[in-house]
Amino acid sequence: MTLGHRLIPVQNVGIYVPAGRYPLPSTALMLTIPAKVAGVEKVVACSPAFKGFGTVHPAVLVAMDIAGVDEIYCTGGAQAIAAMAFGTETVKKVDLIAGPGNRFVAEAKRQVLGSVGIDSIAGPSEVLVIADEMANPKYTAIDLLAQSEHDPNARATLITTSEKLAADVLAWIKTYAGELSTGETA
């Protein structure tokens, strides 16, 4: 008798690439490449039309092509999750859905769980940084902004015993937020 385990990839995966405030080609890569490396036969992608383009953002399309997405649909939100979970005349049902999204996408993924596999039910981005007086305030500010720029509902929290660090981090946040195209959100 031999005891062990075998990794058997699902046949097809649906990825969801949001198109809210800015294009996310890295999301297409981060979702598709692991699936392809694992041996998934078919990757189906859904992404809404990007503002001003009327279709999936060109940078996202290029990333999907490079990563090896097999089918791309210009649809988003809860309806894209439902299409991949249950299938339509156009979109075939997938075995598993992965990818981030807003609260409606998260709720849709929660509701289809059981009919199809999902990666997780993600909420708004959040980060908690615990730092003492030895922390670099510039890097600490960047760590906080890296999450808070995603969404107005994102939360970035610093816990420190150093009043100087707290003041310096706040100053760097104000500086960097002023330079970011997403600074108002952050």
Segments from the language model and where they lie:
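Short beta-strand/turn micro-motifs composed of small residues
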Residues: 17, 47, 131, 160-161
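Short acidic, glycine/serine/threonine-rich loops at helix termini
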Residues: 26-28, 54-60, 84-87, 107-111, ...
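Short, conserved catalytic or adaptor-binding loops enriched in Gly and charged residues
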Residues: 63-66, 119-121, 179-186
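NAD(P)-dependent aldehyde/semialdehyde dehydrogenase
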Residues: 153-186
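A structural signal for isolated positions on well-ordered beta-strands in alpha/beta enzyme cores
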Residues: 42-44, 128, 157
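Short, hinge-like loop/turn segments at secondary-structure boundaries
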Residues: 61-65, 90-92, 174-176
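Conserved NAD(P)+-binding/catalytic subdomain of aldehyde/semialdehyde dehydrogenases
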Residues: 66-155
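Conserved small-residue-rich beta-alpha loop and adjacent elements
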Residues: 1-58, 62
